[in-house]
Each structure stands twice: as C-alpha cells, then as structure tokens.
C-alpha cells in the first residue's frame, strides 16, 4: 500500500496531538495498511526528529514484542524497537502521576548499558556481550496513543513501540557472572504477584533481543553507541495500572526496582 509523505506527516502529528491532549486516536493501520512496516517506522522517525528538534535527548532504544505472552496479548508475531529519551527516565521508587502515560501498562525488563559501539549489521552474540558494560533491573511503563490498545504491529511501531517512560533500579552489575537467560522475574502490585517470567522468555535470551536490535540499527545507518541504554523487552505479561498502585519487581541475580502511581 503506497502512502504519501503528507499522510505520514499527518499521522505523525495525530500521534503527537494524542500525547499532548491525553486523548487516544483510532488505529493507524487503516491509513497505511496492516503490513506496511516501512510506513510505520517512517512515522516513528518523523516524531523522533520532531522531539529532537524540540530539545529532547536520545539516550537509547527499547525492544518491544520480545515475549510470546506479550505478543499474544497484542496479536503480533515479531519484535520492534522504539527510541528512549532522557525525559522518560525515572528513579527507583519514584511516585508518578497516573496521567504520566496515556493508557498505562507496566512490565519488568532487563536493561543494558553499552560501553562499546556496535557498528556492524552482522553483530554476533559474543560481540554484543563484550560491548555490554552494565546490567540493571527496569520497569517500563508502556502506553498507547491508540484508543483501547486496539493495535497491531504497524500501530505500535508508528507509536514509538508504545513507549511511555521507564524506571531503573539497582544495583548496577557487570554482565560477567549474571545468567540473564535463567534470571527469574517476579512482579507484584500492592504486594500480590501479577506477572512472572524469566530471561528465556525474551527471544530465548535478553542478549538475543539486543543482537537483533544492534543488527537492525546498524542496517538502518543508526548504529548503537557506547553509553546507549537498551531495554531488552518484557520478561512476563504486561499489567494494567491504576492510581494508588505500587509495583515492585525482583529479577534473580540482578536486583529490584519499584514505582508507585499517584493521582493526576
């Protein structure tokens, strides 16, 4: 399905408007086609460029749709990526407004910080591991500018992979000696378990997800760099969020992270 530049720009503006106004819009797939990933990423790039021009600072990338349970929840069958900005980052145990993210949901993830550039489109698992400086637990608060989370692959891609904000926990660890694949995750809401999983549910290994991202970004001419933060994807099902909720996640061998949601 051919999509004009004018249409791409109109859809990008509609997503920005939804974010600014707090009012979700209809799915984009009707305008660009259900399988038009090229157009979806073009919309995402337009909004990233708009954000950078407005002074927002890129600090890394997120990988979405890596967990089979999340894929089933959203009716998709492949990963995607989005851009992380500095103003999306929050500290461990912060209290966030429930209106911080539109239609918020939460998931626990393993975050990586690179200490070397990854310029090659054929980056290997070993090269990715060598380039990873630090590992830490994270909570990603995802959101959707699309009404009722009625999304397919192209909808979430265009919407910056349904990015909202994220919380980084601790301690910060070196990768050596940490078994990311076997790392078990348990997330609670107000003390009751609501999500669980392990690193193996993230494309078989969180570093597999990071390799996919490194290859993809290098192929696009935007390779990952030293200092970049990578959110590697959900370790278990995402969970809805309401005002007053407190979430805590523990990832075995890595650490803990928490966040609380207050009123508007």
Curated annotation (Swiss-Prot):
Record-level GO cellular component terms: cytoplasm
Pathway(s) it belongs to: Aromatic compound metabolism; 3-phenylpropanoate degradation
PANTHER family: 2-KETO-4-PENTENOATE HYDRATASE, ACID HYDRATASE
Superkingdom classification of source: Bacteria
Cited InterPro entries: Fumarylacetoacetase-like_C (IPR011234), Fumarylacetoacetase_C_sf (IPR036663), Hydratase-Decarb/MhpD_sf (IPR050772), Keto_pentenoate-hydratase (IPR023793)
Keywords, comma-separated and alphabetical: Aromatic hydrocarbons catabolism, Lyase
Residues annotated as signal peptide: none
Catalytic activity: (S)-4-hydroxy-2-oxopentanoate = (2Z)-2-hydroxypenta-2,4-dienoate + H2O
Pfam families per UniProt: FAA_hydrolase (PF01557)
Protein's UniProt name: 2-keto-4-pentenoate hydratase
GO biological process: 3-phenylpropionate catabolic process
Cofactor(s) it depends on: a divalent metal cation
Gene: mhpD
GO MF terms held by the record: 2-oxopent-4-enoate hydratase activity; manganese ion binding
Organism of derivation: Azotobacter vinelandii (strain DJ / ATCC BAA-1303)
UniProt xrefs under HAMAP family: MhpD
Family in the record: Belongs to the hydratase/decarboxylase family. MhpD subfamily.
Described function: Catalyzes the conversion of 2-hydroxypentadienoic acid (enolic form of 2-oxopent-4-enoate) to 4-hydroxy-2-ketopentanoic acid.
EC number: 4.2.1.80
Leading EC class: lyase
């Amino acid at each position: 399905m051919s999509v004009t530049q004018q249409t791409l720009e109109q859809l990008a503006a509609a997503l920005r408007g939804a974010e600014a106004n707090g009012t979700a819009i209809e799915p984009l797939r009707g305008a660009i086609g259900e399988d038009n990933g090229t157009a979806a990423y073009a919309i995402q790039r337009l909004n990233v460029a708009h954000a950078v021009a407005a002074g927002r600072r890129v600090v890394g990338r997120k990988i979405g749709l890596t967990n089979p349970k999340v894929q089933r929840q959203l009716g998709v069958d492949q990963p995607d990526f989005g851009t992380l900005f500095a103003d999306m980052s929050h500290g461990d145990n912060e209290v966030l407004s429930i209106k911080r993210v539109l239609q918020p949901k939460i998931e626990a993830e393993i975050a990586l910080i690179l200490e070397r550039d990854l310029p090659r489109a054929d980056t290997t698992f070993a090269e990715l591991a060598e380039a990873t400086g630090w590992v830490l637990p994270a909570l990603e608060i995802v959101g959707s500018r699309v009404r009722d989370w009625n999304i397919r692959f192209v909808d979430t891609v265009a919407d910056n992979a349904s990015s909202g904000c994220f919380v980084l926990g601790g301690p910060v660890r070196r990768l050596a000696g940490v078994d990311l694949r076997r790392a078990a995750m348990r997330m609670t809401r107000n003390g009751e378990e609501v999500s669980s999983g392990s690193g193996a549910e993230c494309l078989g290994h969180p570093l597999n997800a990071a390799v996919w991202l490194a290859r993809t970004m290098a192929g696009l001419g935007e390779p990952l760099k030293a200092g970049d933060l990578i959110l590697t994807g959900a370790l278990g099902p995402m969970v809805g969020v309401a005002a007053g909720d407190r979430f805590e996640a523990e990832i075995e061998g890595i650490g803990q992270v928490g966040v609380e949601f207050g009123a508007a």
